[in-house]
Amino acid sequence: MFGIGKKKAYAEHMAPQWMKILTDCRDLVNKTADPDVFFPRYELLKETAANLASISKYVKFRGTKPAEVLKMAQEQEEAATRDFILRSFQRALLGAEKAKTAKGKRSQFDRFLEKLEPYYCQMSAGNAKLVQQLHADAIKRIGG
């Protein structure tokens, strides 16, 4: 009995904090174009959803249940990563438009590729190929 009471108190204490983390992560992964933000925050989102799911028998949640949020995060990870890649490429395109020289334009697209390469292991083969294809097409367009 004592163990359950402690678990419930812990769950009630942690739930609001984990909900805030979950909300912050959701907002960041849906808006950022920085891979150093996107990938760690997506992992934190899944971890936090799992934590919330583990305490759901002690705390009532309104709206979507934490286990469902975790399932959606796992199922939609590839699509979310693709959306992120396209946002990141858009940022590179904007930078290239502002650049005055072909070298400056190319450096925007090279930076796009270089920043994403370390994260290939965290994305599907299709998304890694998308990054490479976007880079190759952009370099072709500027005559590189």
Predicted feature locations:
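TPR-adjacent "capping" and linker segments in tetratricopeptide-repeat scaffold/adaptor proteins
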Residues: 2-13, 73, 80-84
